[in-house]
From Swiss-Prot:
Residues 91-94 are annotated as: G3. This is Elongation factor 1-alpha. The keyword Nucleotide-binding applies. The keyword Nucleotide-binding applies. Its main location: cytoplasm. It comes from Entamoeba histolytica (strain ATCC 30459 / HM-1:IMSS / ABRM). Pfam families: GTP-eEF1A_C (PF22594), GTP_EFTU (PF00009), GTP_EFTU_D2 (PF03144). GO terms for biological process: translation; translational elongation. It is found in: Cytoplasm. GTP binds at residues 14-21, 91-95, 153-156.
Length: 442
């Protein structure tokens, strides 16, 4: 048996018309899980609708439409492979909940592909103050996406000019550096997602470019380390009652290892029970590791005791607990007015969805250095501001420090049906043990 290829999760970011769908569609089309029949169907429909030239974006638009209509489509369609890795596109902007998904996303992106359009005016619109390019770069950095590849797209529209490519590279590099990335470690690839230049094969139209193709750049990313050595953390997505088996919580292992026989403690309530068995895709597992989506059977607990948003951990190894309050670095991205103390939006953190109060605005933060700015407590914060905030949940909640457990330490601040801010947890005040252990069961 050949060793299975390493899985890598990608998020595709960039301004609205930069050509993300076309580029992504092209990769899936050429290296991915779409069979010939589906492609022919798409080509035919595309021609019938007068789209004339078959656009790769068509692939993605169809998948997206099916996804949004709630048709569960084969997730393999969002996968493609290279000689080294299996890639899964975990999200692409254009989905209504893109930003929320990126934060609470069941999986952390290992690498971001930033697509920028080279066209005159197009690039400038994307990188302008209200363009999405900056927002997405900032988001990726805040959420701990360490690796990035930049695709300078639509090179065909500017006659493959090197000067324009260099100009864009210079400007994006400056912004990446300001955000905290090291641009020297980021490959910039001039591409045409539509014509196929430098996507998979080196382009004959750009003899001046000596770097890797987009696929080549993807092949040279560093595989992520999966955090098996950390204590167990498994946020629950659902809890099922299955006749003949009992109570089955379901979720994704974020850190650590779950084995049958483990005494599992659930936060924030503190109830605990032995894990009897674990299943993934209807197959029994001897252990579940980070990245595994599993169901596991617990004794003596009902669906009233545990619910979505709870966090399962090992009772004997630094178990998760509920929090009284926590301090977080919050970046305001999309709020129409001023946020003052007392503001109580909904926070989406891992699988939980709970109203939380901004108890105190502690200080503004200089985004370049990450340090608190002079001037003490701000009266309010607004779009573009980064601040240290003390947050109090209105109901029991379990969060962790981002530095220790990243997936449990990132959150989206939701208000008016949109993501108004993002944050990472810096410090947590745990709830007193006796307050939560009253309902303990074995």
């Amino acid at each position: 048996m050949p060793k299975e290829k390493t899985h890598i999760n990608i998020v595709v970011i960039g301004h609205v018309d930069s050509g993300k769908s076309t580029t992504t569609g092209h990769l899936i089309y050429k290296c991915g899980g779409i069979d010939q029949r589906t492609i022919e169907k798409f080509e035919k429909e595309s021609a019938e609708m007068g789209k004339g030239s078959f656009k790769y974006a068509w692939v993605l638009d169809n998948l997206k439409a099916e996804r949004e209509r709630g048709i569960t489509i084969d997730i393999s369609l969002w996968k493609f492979e290279t000689s080294k890795y299996y890639f899964t596109i975990i999200d692409a902007p254009g989905h209504r909940d893109f930003i929320k998904n990126m934060i609470t996303g069941t999986s952390q992106a290992d690498v971001a592909i930033l697509i920028v359009a080279a066209g005159t005016g197009e690039f400038e619109a994307g990188i302008s103050k209200n363009g999405q390019t900056r927002e997405h770069i900032l988001l990726s950095y805040t959420l701990g996406v360490k690796q990035m590849i930049v695709g300078v797209n639509k090179m065909d529209a500017i006659q493959y000019k090197q000067e324009r490519y260099e100009e864009i590279k210079k400007e994006i590099s400056a912004f990446l550096k300001k955000t905290g990335y090291n641009p020297d470690k980021i490959p910039f690839v001039p591409i045409s997602g539509f014509q196929g230049d430098n996507m998979i094969e080196p382009s004959t139209n750009m003899p001046w470019y000596k770097g890797p193709t987009l696929i080549g750049a993807l092949d040279s990313v560093t595989p992520p380390e999966r955090p098996v050595d950390k204590p167990l953390r498994l946020p629950l997505q659902d809890v099922y009652k299955i006749s003949g088996i009992g109570t089955v919580p379901v979720g994704r292992v974020e850190t650590g290892i779950l084995k049958p026989g483990t005494i599992v403690q659930f936060a924030p309530s503190g109830v605990s029970s032995e894990c009897k068995s674990i299943e993934m895709h209807h197959t029994a597992l001897a252990q579940a590791i980070p990245g595994d989506n599993v169901g596991f059977n617990v004794r003596n607990l009902t669906v009233k005791d545990i619910k979505r948003g709870n966090v399962a951990s090992d009772a004997k190894n630094q178990p998760a607990v509920g929090c009284e309050d926590f301090t977080a670095q919050v970046i305001v991205m999309n709020h129409p007015g001023q946020i003052r103390k007392g503001y109580t939006p909904v926070l989406d953190c891992h699988t939980s969805h709970i109203a939380c109060k901004f108890e105190e605005l502690l200080s503004k933060i200089d985004r370049r250095t990450g340090k608190s700015m002079e001037g003490g407590e701000p009266e309010y914060i607004k779009n573009g501001d980064s601040a240290l905030v003390k947050i109090v949940p209105t109901k029991p909640l379990c969060v962790e420090e981002f530095a220790k457990f990243p997936p449990l330490g990132r959150f989206a601040v939701r208000d008016m049906k949109q993501t108004v801010a993002v944050g990472v947890v810096k410090a947590v005040t745990p709830r007193a043990a006796n307050a939560s252990a009253a309902g303990k069961k074995k």
